[in-house]
Structures are given as C-alpha cells and as structure tokens.
C-alpha cells in the first residue's frame, strides 16, 4: 500500500471552500513560512479510498478479540459516542461565558462526584490527558505535599517490580530516586523487602492493585499502613481498576491519591481511537494542590493542561456510568474477573499461567519452558495469533515473567468468543511441536510481517520525506 504522500498529484483538490467575504490581511513577513508545507494533494474519492483501505488493515475491538493485557480493550458502547457528539458538548468553546456552559460544568461535577464515590477519594481533576500524564500529576501532588511541609529529605519513591510499566519513569520525571522492590513467590509485594527500604527519605509508594500479573495483593492494608507509618504517601495506579470498581475502593485500601484511565475502565475509545483522560483523585488533605481546585495566586502555575482536559472523553465516561448504574458497575468488574479466570483455565491445558491461582481481570502465561522444548517464543505465538484474527496479547511484560504473554479478555466478551480463542491457543500449541517454522515466520497473511524493531528503535523515521 502506498503512503498518502505517494498518491499526491500537484493541483488536485478535495475541498470546496466558500468565497471569502472579508478583507484579506497580509501577515508580517517574519511570521510567514519560507516555503509551502508538504501536504498531500488528492481528490475526495482518492482520500476516502486511502483511509478505507487503511481501516481494512487494522484490528480493533470492533473487528475481533483484543486481549491486550493491562489495556482493558473493552467494547465501547455507541451511545457514548452519540452523547459526545451532541452539539452542546461537541461545539462548545472553552472560553465561552459561564452561563453558556452550565451543562458542561454539570457533566464535570457529576462525573467527579461519581468517580469519588467509586474510588473513595475527596477531590478530582480531569486535566491530565492520559494515564501516564495522570501518574505524573499524582506524584507531583505527593511532592508538593512534602515540600509544603518543609520535608525535603524525602527523595525516594518505592515501585514494586509488579507495578505498571510507566511508574518508574513517572517517579524519575518528578525528580525522585526510584527504589525497586521484588515480588514474593506468590506474585505480591514482599513485605520484608518493603520494610527494608522504608525510612524518612521515602516520599511514597506507587502500586497497582490488582497488580500487573493479575493478582490482588491481600496484604494491601498492611502495605499502606507501613508506608504511612514511615511518613510516606500511597499512590494508586488505576490501570487495573476495572477488576474492582464498585466492589472495593482504593481510598479504603489506604491510598492517598489515584489516577484512572477513563479511556480504559470507563469505555471511551483508546489505542488510536482516543484521546484519553487520566483523571486524578485525591484525599482531602491533598486537594489544595490539585490543579483545578486550588486558588491561584498571582504568577502561580497549577495546571497540567489547558482548560478542563479532554472534555468529550469525560462525557463518554459519564454516559457509560449512567448506563451501568450502581448495580451494573460491580457486575462489569465481576464479569471481567470471571472471563479472565475462565479463559485462563481453558488455556491451562496447553500454555501454563505464571501463577497458578485465581486471577483478577488478567493473567500472565509464562512460555519459558515451552520455548526450550519447541524453539517457539512468546513473540512467535503472538504473531501467529494475527493470522487467526486475534490481536496479540501484551508481550514480554511484566518483566518478572520470562517469555510472558499477558491476556485481559474484559467483561464485554462472550463465552463463545473465549472458547474460540482457547481453541486457537490449543491449535498453536500443537503446531509448535509439529511445524515450529510456520510459527517462527508468522504472520503470513498480514499487511506487514515482522518489522525490524531494533533498527526502528535505533534509527527511527518519524515523518515522511520526499
């Protein structure tokens, strides 16, 4: 397939613009480009065909099973999109006078109230644009709290090895030294390792519960108690909130602040269908540092994004919450856990889970022994799934499991879909022993086979050039 730039023909147009009825204004020379931008020139039909062809080469939740672990690729109800497309929401200007955006304000306030009830927090902001941005905002709350108290010796953030992947980077970006602690044999936080690193130099702990191997840490109250006794705060990464929403609240576990991925847990499209929203909630004592709730003094800057963040994502999330209601929210979490355990047990006769115990919303397969026996890697299995209409699971993560495949089926998949997926895994397991080369060269039917990822990382080509 050609790039859109390669289809460009000079002078070809697809836009019909009305005649200009205002006077021309000449921009100052210093504000003008020196040369025209390199934009493709196509007719409308060519443009339509190009993007139609592109969509036929991608795989989304609307196309088939998408068990991308730790990403919660659930189906996004169409009604959410319809609500976000209402003119009063889609056409609003962020600088409109307050009386003209009362409905938008009500959306933000109502969603904030519901999310505080679900998470056990007291304050909420929707400014962060995505999950990692929410993490960044949450850790800055912790930093500002300690700084405001003159407690500048707290320079470390504890991050377990089963935490979400962006946590160490977030802590480092906020200026903290990252202290990694290992998991115990059961996949949960090693309490003795935690106790060994706690001290008056610890600012806080970043934790996901359930963690990235899909296990709910039963020692969570003890973990947060230990951190608080050492003077630190506890940050909850909401990446896996889908497993427990409406059932248990992070605030009741002892967490002081949290970010949620509205674009995951609350069914607003992501993974190319975005944008996202990394809502951040906190306990009352941190509210003065929350971007939208603080009263700004002259020259002070307490924003992490312009206006109210990605507002239409909040509209979609509210539509989702209202559709499910108080009874439907915990039911969705229960079905997510049920589906994950069902699929894990169906697959277990072939590929083995890294932790042979009841999981939450996701589980991790460990293919290290399988690779030794067959020469087929986790990557080969993932690529082979593409030929069978299934999006690959998350590969080689978490790092504590060798040859890892992480699957999260979500609550919106039917039993029939899970049975079909389990059958595909069984077929691939047998194929690895009878024709491993077929798997090592997969995919065979995709538009792109196996790009050179090492070369792409070392010498990235990020834009088209003539």
Write out the residue ranges for each language-model feature.
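Active-site lining segments that contact anionic ligands and/or coordinate catalytic metals
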Residues: 121, 154, 201-202, 229-233, ...
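Mobile "lid/hinge" segments at catalytic clefts and subdomain interfaces of large enzymes
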Residues: 275-344
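General small-molecule cofactor/ligand-binding pocket signal
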Residues: 125, 179-181, 393
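Non-catalytic terminal extensions of PLP-dependent enzymes
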Residues: 1-123, 147, 248, 303-304, ...
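Conserved PLP-enzyme active-site core in the AAT-like
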Residues: 103-106, 133-299, 375-376, 403
